[in-house]
A protein has these predicted regions:
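C-terminal regulatory/effector modules of DNA-binding transcriptional regulators
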Residues: 199-305
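Interdomain hinge/linker segments and adjacent boundary elements that couple functional modules
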Residues: 2-32, 36, 40, 45-50, ...
C-alpha cells in the first residue's frame, strides 16, 4: 500500500540541506577549517570568492559542506588564506583521505542511514543509549529484519527496502572488527531484552549474540534495570560519537538523536555536553558489565527458550 501523505515542510527542508553523497567526517572537518582560515585572514565569503573568481555561494556551500572541494580549488583557497606550506600539505592530505574513505556503495545509496553511517565509520568511540531496541551495531540480521518490518507497517516503502536496510545495517557493523576497532559502549533498557521482535528463536539468537559481543574487548554493554528505585527516563535513543584528531584538525563530538524523521545531528558543544552528561549518568545507574551479562543470560534462559 502506497502512502499518500503530503510532503511536509520539514521533508522539503531536509531535502534542501542534504549534503553530497560520499560526505565524510573528514570532509566536514575540512569545511570547518576552511571557514576558520578565511576568518583568520580577515576575509568575508564574498571577498574570498571575488579573489579566486568564484561566486559567493560556492564559498558558502564549501564551508557548509554542501559540496566538496577539488584539490585545485583547495590549493587556491589555502594560498589566498596565507596557509604555510607544512599545514597546506596536511590539509591536502586530509582532503585526499576524505575522498578515499567511503562506505560501500549500497550504504552510500541509502541516504537516511548514510550520513549517520559515515560519521560512525570515522568515529573513534560511540556511546549509545537504547530504550526500545537492541543497538543497531549489535543486531542480528533476523532481529534487524523484524524491527524494520514493523516500521514498514507504519510507513510503507518500496519493494525490497527492508532487505536493503538490513544489508546496510550489517555493513555498518564492520566498524566493530576493523583495525583499530570502534570502541562501543551501550546502555540498554532492560525492557529491550523482553520486547519481542520476530519469533522466540529470533529473540534467543539475538540475546545470545549480545552475550557474545559483551565478551569483546572493544564492546561494553550495560543494562538499565527495571527493578529498584530508578526512574523510567524520558530520554530517547541517541549516539554520542567522538573522533580522533587528524592532521592537527580537530572535530567536535557529534550526537545523533533518533526520532520519527530519522536521525539528526547536534554539534554545538553546549548541546553535546548535555548528552554526554546524560549518558554518563545512565551508565552509572545501570548494572555493571558483569551483572549485565548475567541478566542477559537469565533473560535468554527464562524468556526465549
Amino acid at each position: 500500500m502506497k502512502s499518500h501523505l503530503p510532503e511536509s515542510p520539514r521533508d522539503r527542508e531536509k531535502a534542501r540541506r542534504v549534503p553530497e553523497q560520499g560526505a565524510s567526517v573528514g570532509g566536514r572537518r575540512l569545511a570547518a577549517e576552511l571557514r576558520r582560515l578565511r576568518e583568520r585572514a580577515g576575509l568575508t565569503g564574498e571577498e574570498a570568492a571575488e579573489r579566486v573568481g568564484w561566486s559567493g555561494s560556492k564559498i558558502s556551500r564549501i564551508e557548509r559542506h554542501q559540496i566538496g572541494v577539488k584539490l585545485t580549488d583547495l590549493r587556491k583557497l589555502l594560498a589566498l588564506y596565507g596557509v604555510d606550506e607544512s599545514y597546506r600539505d596536511e590539509l591536502l592530505a586530509l582532503a585526499r583521505e576524505s575522498r578515499q574513505r567511503a562506505l560501500p556503495q549500497k550504504a552510500a545509496a541509502n541516504f537516511p542511514v548514510a550520513t549517520y553511517a559515515y560519521a560512525e565509520a570515522e568515529a573513534e568511540s560511540v556511546w549509545n543509549w537504547e530504550p526500545q531496541v537492541v543497538p543497531g551495531l549489535l543486531q542480528t540480521p533476523d532481529y534487524a529484519r523484524a524491527v524494520r518490518q514493523l516500521w514498514q507497517q507504519m510507513f510503507p516503502g518500496p519493494p525490497g527496502e527492508t532487505e536493503r536496510w538490513v544489508e546496510v545495517r550489517l555493513l555498518r557493523q564492520q566498524v566493530l572488527t576493523r583495525d583499530p576497532p570502534l570502541q562501543l559502549s551501550v546502555v540498554i533498557d532492560e525492557s529491550v531484552l523482553r520486547r519481542r521482535f520476530g519469533d522466540e528463536a529470533v529473540m534467543r539468537r539475538q540475546l545470545e549474540h549480545l552475550s557474545a559481543a559483551a565478551e569483546l574487548p572493544n564492546i561494553e554493554i550495560r543494562i538499565y534495570p527495571l527493578a529498584g528505585d530508578l526512574p523510567s527516563l524520558p530520554v530517547g535513543a541517541f549516539s554520542y560519537m567522538q573522533f580522533p584528531q587528524v592532521h592537527d584538525v580537530p572535530l567536535h563530538d557529534i550526537v545523533s538523536v533518533e526520532n520519527l524523521d530519522g536521525n539528526y545531528d547536534l554539534e554545538d558543544e553546549q548541546e553535546t555536553f548535555r548528552y554526554r552528561v546524560a549518558f554518563e549518568h545512565l551508565a552509572k545507574w545501570s548494572l555493571d558489565p558483569d551483572q549485565s551479562r548475567a541478566l542477559i543470560a537469565t533473560a535468554t534462559r527464562d524468556g526465549w527458550q
